[in-house]
Amino acid sequence: MVIKYLNKKGQEFEIDCGKDEILLQAGLRNGVVLPYECSTGTCGSCKALAKPGTVNVNEKDLDGFKNVKISKGEFLLCQGTAKENCKILLNTNLSKSNKDEQLPFHQIAYLKDFKEVARETITANFYLSGKISFKAGQYIIVKHPSVEGYRAYSMTNFEENSDLLSLVIKNKINGKLTNYLFDSKDDEIKFDIFGPIGKATFNPLEKKNLLMIAGGTGIAGLMSILNHADQLRYFEDYKVDL
């Protein structure tokens, strides 16, 4: 299917989209810079507008849908899929990714090396079928057949052109995926993953002191930033407050 992202400023980009492909993922993998933060339906940052009936809204009991007026054609890019060729209106600037940036893509990965490091907290590694380069602070979204929808996990390591991603995973009360992982007896678990994505990243060329606060996004992304900074000996010249 052909999808056209556009805004009222006249900026527009046309891409090919797969059947049942999530519209945010389709745009990002084709290099279109789209509005998003969580990519999983929590924040509502990717709200868009399409002609009613052209998009499967896939409404769920998620916080991101609270201010979405579905009857008027609004939906979330991170949940919606196209029914047919369609136009998607966005209330934001549109542009293409820099040529040197790693575009996100789908691949199969195996989660292994489970190790308990604290109560209800484990570390584990994703072994990828293809290598990726990611910025410190970025994340991936993962999908397992036993759980509906995607879940986001930030990497704790930093390595360019890597086929291994390290995670910290906390078992959440009523967390369907984490409950499954903590109950599983398997040595490895197969996932579909999409990434790298995320805009809250570390750029050492900015040459600034760092203030790092772990909130709703957790500590994992900050660990990746610290790893990258340590590799560069960044803190020999700049300060960090945690």
Question: Residues of each region from the PLM?
Answer:
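Residue-level "contact hotspot" at macromolecular interaction interfaces
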Residues: 16, 37, 69, 81, ...
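N-terminal pre-ligand scaffold of iron-sulfur
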Residues: 1-34
